[in-house]
Every structure is written in structure tokens, then in C-alpha cells.
């Protein structure tokens, strides 16, 4: 077929379904890029958002031969199926590496597999020698001798280490930029594909799930694009990679430039194109024998901590060193630096020091304050930050024998916590405690409980997907934890066995589906094999089953007798065929629970009926999280009111410094993932799961049962979850930073109480008072005089009330309201209004924003959420950070500003006298506290003065005072660390 014939046939082809609004927007963005002469198109669409249709439509419009690269065979099959929705069927699509069809769909592995020969062994050995020199201080001869001895011994570690340094050598070649050297690393099959493409262009190259292209695959794809020359690159992903280093970001930009369109998940849920969902968690603690092991590990670490606190440990004891570091804070030049600078230069050390001081009940250092993050127990990472600083800055430079001995003692103790001390610092190692938490048997038990409740709630409609990291555990994975964990702990195979053994979950007929195995119970196998014979006649005489036997289980282990593998004796039985087949079996409801690995079913796999996801993986990157969650978000045509329940199972070991490792992963999973809260707000972070969950540490284990009960109850209340999404309602489509405020209960003069929203009278109080005063005075000789005096003049109000003593309780109450409103304010909305106007007047936020944009919303857990309506992401962030600074204790402000506190009047006479004083002095009171002028507004005197005008208007009389002023220095020293309000704040992000 000629190039012209292909273009004509593709032009005559069309997608049989109308494109959704955002799909059409993506195609329009492509056309705009093409009009601009660009040969790149990059779209970010959520899982289930129809990326495949968009990619094929773009390829159709380009009218060229097309190669689609995707991450696995399940996704490959979906591309081929989707092309069948383009009619008429005059252009063939296939999966032949010989590129025999105009549209070819291959996996990245088919193209990018590397040559397995030893061409880089010399470079790998050089890297190995250099590494031994750096880490162990060897000479080149010593390093070479150790490697040769390892090879001669026949140790498997030699082959493993050589393979590792080969990979590193290949990476260096890839980063070197020589295209021919890089392409020479490819397997001959990959080089043959490139040669065929070069001889038959021009091409459209579609890169599906292109977030994978950060390292070797990315370098190879970039080399392919450069080799072909005339190629249009289409990048598609649901999850653009985050946390890229500079090299990865540059590579990604080289391939794709910038995104042409990005559509967030909540937008498609609100539009009704994805299913609403709720994020749920089941919290567990280790089983008794696991807890005993963790306690033993904890004891070792406690011994180290006790030694660190002894005054004869090292020439400079650890507590003395720490006190000196955080109080004197010497920079590299020896000069003392501010806490702000110290925190910026040493963020991990600063956080760890604050947490340690808070745990001791000690005040923060000058210029610091305890935030929500700092009021958490120390984690293992915190201790490591403190210990690393002590080792590198105090012990290592010293030749004192006490310091040498202290270094060795720390070096021997750290591996039990999962760290290794080297000359360059402390680096993470595999932590046995973390592994026990990740693979705890309590998680499988939790999965059974979850599926039990979900089955009761959904009945025959249940379609559950349980994801694990691997199908089966290797023999060495858990070698150090024999007797603590099952040899197959964490594997999909063990989970299948557990589900098949429990009477409740066995009724779901769970099936294990991976890239190499289909397994189930013997009872399920009877139905499954018969069904397969009906669907694939050529397998009718080929069906066989055999017992699933896994490494690490001896012959006496009879648990696996009831678990069998389906393995037809036919070449037809390949993942790209049996995965769609088993998916259909699942969607028909013959099995209501699939167990699989995230590598196959956690990305790209499409099953519309999945409505429960149980995530048992350790993957916590935004990419992995969005991909796995995306499996449950597709609309189900048979269940119009579908709500997906996405479950995490988290194991916490209370008391152990590494005991929050699994919870920390849970926090990372939800860090920038949006979901509906119980309030119906779309929020990122773990608080959208449950308001008691903090990003800085787990709740008290005593609350686990109550939280789990609440989660299981929500699984039964899908209608409420559906309603929280407000499907069909308009949305702004922007992220908004907010601050949540919880009010204390201890008011006082030096520590006043921040008024809850609504506690402060509205603007109509003065007019209401005047009308009622006129009613009381009507008919009296003095009426006209007093009402006239009462006008806007507060003294007239006071005179009026004194003259009409006994005129009514409501009159006294209204006067109290008016006087309080015109006096200094301690109301949240007034302080927020002052911050908003100060930022607006200094150009810190958009000019259309201000006091009228402030919103304060009561929350069910006792917090109030404050934010700026209509603000951009950047403006909302600046506002919430500034408001948080004003509400917080003084740390090291550049400017401070007073807020007066008025005594509440106790009688009618007190009210009158207060009114007279306010008329004379303005918004002052008998006591005063000071607040920090927010950093942005304290950048210079002009900004501080403009903030002061807004502060005077809404909060209190007072002028900003520069920190070097003697008065300010004395105030800061006196008030530092004291909370001007008894409040707790939390910073959160909403999607609106």
C-alpha cells in the first residue's frame, strides 16, 4: 500500500462513537499543535478517560504508518480491540514485529530489550572497582583482587553484582548522548525493527503510558526519534511523572516538550464520564509473633539511643552536640544563622530536632515554632537525620579514640533499623521491620474482612480486584525472616490460597491472574475449565490443571493441595489472549474477585465492572497510585449508580521508630490524589479518607477499631458517597489551598480566644440597635434628642442606653454586639479579611480578590476551613500560608503588629463606658498581644504599612514594628513560642 493510499483510507475511516467533550478538546489541542508546525503532541488524560481512542484518532488524522508502544500485553490487546471501533475496516492493525500492517502495536520491551552479551564487561568492572575504592577505601589492586576472589569462589553474588554494574554502564552509555553507541546496546530484534522503520517512513510514533520513559526506555525512544527523522510523536499518559531529577526532566522535555492538554480525574467524575469513588483504609497492627520480632529489633535500637544519651559516649556527647547545633546554628563559615536559614539549609535535621525537643517538652529554638508536622513522634528517619549529622560533623573528623569507638558502635547498630553508615553518610537499606509491616499476615486477614463486608453490600454486583506486588516470593526474599513471615508472604499466590480457604471469600470464586499464571481453587477450576472450553473450542482437548506448588514450601505443607493452575497444553495460551478471556469470565460474575499483580492488572488493564480495589502493594509513587486507582473508575453500563471503593490496608507497629513506615507510604500514596471527603469536598491527602488521619503520623492505635468500623460502614453507604461528588454540577477546575482551624477552649488576656465564625455580629447590628432604641424612647420628651445623638456616634449610643435603663434585655444585648463589633476583633473571618486585603493591596494576589473572597466553612470534626473563593492555585497558597503565619506563635518575624483585646462588658454601664473609650482611642483594649506580619507582607516597610491599614480596618488599631526596634526585640523575646490563639491549624488542598 502506497503512502497516498494509506492516507486516503485512514481519512475515510471514522470512530463509531461520538467523542466525549474532553476527548474532543484533546483532538482540538492536537490540531492546534499541528497548525503551529509542531511534531509533538502530549496529552494527560485520567485512567478510563479514553486515551486509546484519542491516540488512534490522532494517528488516523495524521494518515501515516503508525507504531504504538505500550507497557504490557494486556494494554497491547486493548489497542488492537479499540481499532475495531474505527470503520470501515480497510486498514489493518497487528502486533507483528516485522511491521507487516500499517498500524502496529508492540510493547516497549519488544523494541527496547537490550543485548545480553558481555560487550560492556570491561566498563562494568571499572565501575565496580571504583565503587569499592570509594566505599571501602581500597586501592585499585585490592578491589580487583576481591572481585577475582569472588568470581573464583563461584558465588552467585559475583553474577548479581556484575549484572548490576553492567546496567550502570549501560546507563552511562545512554546518558552519553552518542546515538549509535546507544542503539548498539539493543538486541538484534530491536535493531531490526528500527531498520524496518527507517526504510518505510514517514511514521507516527504513539507512546502509551509514556511516564515510563524516564531512564533507559526514554533514552532509547529518543534515539529512535532522532534516527527516524520524519516522525510525529504522540505521548499519552494518565500520570505525568513527578519528582523527576534534572536529568530525567530534560529527557522528558526532549521527547515531549510540554503537555498540550491535562484533564484531572475529579473533572471527569463531575461530568459523569468516570465513576465516583471513595478512598478507604483498614488499619492493622502486626500479629503477636510479628510484634515480638519487631520488639526485639526495637530493643536493639533502644540500646543505641540509650548509649547516645550517655555523657561518656564520644568526646562530645550527643545531647550536647544537638543542643549546640540547634541553638548556635553555625553555618559553613562559622557564623550563626537564623532558624529560617538553618531550616532551609538543613530541612531534615531541623524537623528532627523540633520533634525531639517537642517530645522532651522543651521550647523550640529562637525563631522556630512547633507546627502540626513537628508535634509528631520521632520516626526512624528523624533519628537517622540526627545521628548522621552527629557522625559526619562530630565523630568522623575526630581522631579521639572515644569518637572512633562511638562511630563503630553506631555503624553496627543501624542495620537493624534498615540503614547503613558509610563515610558519606547514612543510606537506606532494606529494613526488616519495614518488610514485616509491608508483608504482615494481618493484611491478608484485613482483605478477607473487607471483601466480606463488600460482598454483603453489593451481592452479585461485587467485582473486586486485589493487587499485590508479585505473584510469588523468591526463595531469598524473606530468607532473613523465616519463622516470622510465611515463605510466600505478600504474594498474590498466598492471598489466593487465603481467600479460597475462607468460606465467605471462597464463595466469590477468586482467580489468580498474572502474566504467567492462571490459578484458582479446585472447585472454581471445574467451572472455569468448562467455560474456557466453550469460549475457545481449540482448547477443548488441551485443558489441564496441576497443583500450585511454590518455592519455600516443603513437601509436608499441604495447604496448597486445593489451589490449582490452569495450563492448557497449547501455544494459544498466551497472556495477550488469556487475559482478555479471564477478564470476561470475571465481568460475567462467574468470579467476583481477581487477584493479580500491579505490573499486569495495575496499569492499562480494562475491566469496566471493577467496583472494589484492595491495594496491598508497596507502590507509593503518584504514577503507580493513579494507575492502580484507575482500574476501578470506569463506568459500568450495568450499574448506572456505580461507586468504586478503593481500599488501602496499612500496618502500624506502635512505639517502634520504623513502625510508621507503612503508614508513611499510605501518606505518600494520597499526597496529591484527590477524593471526596465526608463533607463533600474534593481534597488531596489522607484526610479525605478520614478526618482523624494526619499526613505527619498515624492516629492512636486505640482509635484503629473505630476508624475501621467507620470505613466499613461507609462501604455500605454508597448512595451517600455518590451524592458527595455532586455529579453534573458546575466546577471551577482548579486547586485551592486552604487552612483548617480548630479552636481551643482556654480564653485569656495574654492568650485570647479566636472567635468561631458567626460568633461576631453582622453589619446590621448598629441599624437594628437604633431602631429598637427609638421604639423604647418613643413618646418621651427626650426621644428626639437621644435618637439623634445615637446616629453613627458611639457616644450617642452610650448616652442613649444610660438614659433608658430598663429599656429591655434585647436592647442591652444589641448594644453589646455593636460595641464589640466596633472594637478590636478576634474573629477568624476578620483576621482572614485583613490578610486577604493586605495581599491584594500589595499585589500579592489578584486585584479582584479581597475580604469579600474569604470563605469559612464549618466541618463535622470541629475544624473550620478557610480559603479564598475564586483564587488561583498560587494565590490561594499565598493566602493560606500568610494566614497560618498570623495565627501561629511568634518565631522570627521581620515585623510584628499588635492586636488589642477588649474586656467583655459585664453590665450596661460597662458597655457604655467601653463605647466611650472606643470612641476616644479607636480599636484598642486593655491588653495587647502581637502577631507576625506574614513573610510576603513583611518584605519591606511599604508592604507592612499596607497590611497594617487592612489590619486596622478589620482587626485592631496598631502599627507594624520592625524586629530590630528595641521594643520589638523585647516583645519577641517575651512572647516567642506563646500561642496568641488557642488554635490548631492544618494546611490542605481542595479541588473545586
PLM features: what roles do these ranges have?
Residues 2-42:
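Conserved pre-motif I regulatory segment
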Residues 46-49, 92, 97, 102-103, ...:
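Conserved C-terminal RecA-like helicase domain
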Residues 47, 52-87, 107-113, 217, ...:
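Conserved Walker A/P-loop ATP-binding site and its immediately adjacent core
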Residues 212-274:
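Post-DEXD/H (motif II) to motif III coupling segment of the RecA-like Helicase ATP-binding lobe
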Residues 305-354, 661-910, 917-924:
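Long, largely alpha-helical accessory region at the distal end of helicase-like NTP-driven motors
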Residues 595, 605-618, 627, 644-648:
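A short beta-strand element within the Helicase C-terminal
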Residues 627, 631-663:
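Conserved segment of the helicase C-terminal RecA-like domain
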